[in-house]
Amino acid sequence: MRTFIAITLPQETKTALTAAIKRLAPEAVDVTWCKADQLHLTLAFLGEIAPSILPHLSSAMTHVCGALSAVPCHAHGLGFFGNRRNPKVIWAAVGLPPEMDRLHGGLWQELKRFGFNTDEDRFRPHITLGRCKERARNQALTDAMDADTEIEFGKWTAKDITLYESRPTPKGSLYISLNKFRLGGR
């Protein structure tokens, strides 16, 4: 099963992000936009795992989350991975407070014990809004995004994180919650 660990977004933030997607979509060429129920803040992409590892993984995540506090989150501004003419991913930025940095670091410390690998790049918290198809020219899209660089999508406090399964379907990926882990253990 294909899995990832994420912070779930409040409905108000999803609504604001969906409105931004609707504003940007007319400027986009060959972009697959995320639906509201697919929007999340990824902390760790695990990829394919055996179901037999879930109890051990859940135990480790419970341990990590129990030792950490809730995480203040602030989604604001738009950006992209790739270059201006040919972006690969369109995203909303999320600030990196110390609590989120500790959560991300603590998770990966445990995940490495299970053999998972991470990019050693700096963690760049973001919410993926859309993925551009190969060779799509989207200069007009990135120009339109320039007007929304400081747009606010919401502030909230993440009190838990979720282990999800990503199951492909003909209508796109379906994200299934496998387990929630309370931050602070309360």
PLM feature segments, named:
Residues M1-R186:
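Histidine-dependent nucleotide/RNA phosphoesterase domain, centered on the 2H-phosphoesterase fold
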